[in-house]
Amino acid sequence: SPEDSHKIAAQVPDSAGVMFVPALFGLGTPHWDYGARGTLLGITRGTSRSHVVRAVLEGIAHRGADMVDAVVAATQLEVESIRIDGGMSRNPTFVQALANATRRNVEVSPVTEATTLGAAFLAGVAVSFWPSINEATNTWKPSQIVSPDKELDRAQWHEAISRARNWIPALSSLDF
């Protein structure tokens, strides 16, 4: 659970060089390598369960940063902050890792499953409760804003990605 993984990961200040690439079904944006596989790198005799759990949370955060970087590269738009909801938004270690990996503030939704809130906003606009989607979404306020407090090693992340890629060459060569 988000709570349990936070408790475990919070026992150490960092992952001690352990990296996890969450490519359990290959890698999507921006890598598009269906033959990539989940990879755990940098384990030593001193690696603890807490280091591995923190590395998993940081790996997921790095994938989020990959997607933000892809959006910025494709659109040339500046992404000033990230808004998140869902179960992982209740994991302080993950939220901080996401802020650190993206180098952006992360705004945590007060509603854990905000998909329903978005549907409510659209319904409200459809029945003229709000005159526009901007008016509706202006009513949303984050429950918390988390700022980056250190930089995660994106160069080491890119090295980990390169090691996870092309694990199954026949799948890696697929192009859609």
Language-model regions, residue ranges each:
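Glycine/Thr-rich phosphate-binding loops that ligate phosphate moieties of nucleotide
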Residues: 1-176
